[in-house]
Amino acid sequence: MSKIFILSAGTSPDSYNNQLAKHLSNYFDKKGLENVLFDNLYSDIPFLLDTHDDVPEKILEMRKSLEVSEKIIIFSPVYNGGFLAHLKNTLDWLSLAYDENRYSALFKEKKVAVVTTVKGAGGNAQKAFEILSMQLSNYDLQVFEKFHLITKSEHQNEKSILNNRDVIESLNSLSLIHI
């Protein structure tokens, strides 16, 4: 089985999205599912201003992992009905052509699921998912049609993830896990 690439766009090391991504990564480890988690996307990845800029080391590490991954899970917070700039910046860096690879080669036909955690009720989450989903499709990713909104009370620990039927259903549909 290929590696599962987990990308968390949380706003701090202790953000809800990063916490949940770490819980899921630990769960996959226990199940023997090879995965890699990248978070803190706001750190060590400068904004892409010119496609001729030197590629950040963190992006080079992500490329290596994406090359051997077929499935991606993105944890994305919602702000003002959209997703954060550091997530798009990271995706833009990863979409650049390199070596013999063309634009978006790392993403081509890979399956991606989106999970969103919020402090409140998540009223803007659906619109944010639609915007992010459209962007992910532009990168040639196969976006799972259903996104997952997890409120603060639902993601305090690994057990909470396993009790969230929608998340488990999507992960099963992506053939990531079978519970």
Identify the function of each model-found stretch.
Residues 1-99, 143, 158-177:
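N-terminal beta1-alpha1-beta2 submodule of the flavodoxin-like/Rossmannoid cofactor-binding fold
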Residues 8-10, 116-118, 153-154:
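Short, histidine-centered active-site or binding-site loop motifs used for metal coordination
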Residues 42-44, 119, 150:
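Residue-level detector of flexible, active-site-proximal loop/helix-junction positions
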Residues 96-108:
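Flexible, gly/pro- and Lys/Arg-enriched active-site loops
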Residues 107-148:
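Short, glycine-/small-residue-rich phosphate/pyrophosphate-handling segment
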Residues 148-159:
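Short helix/strand-capping connector loops at secondary-structure junctions
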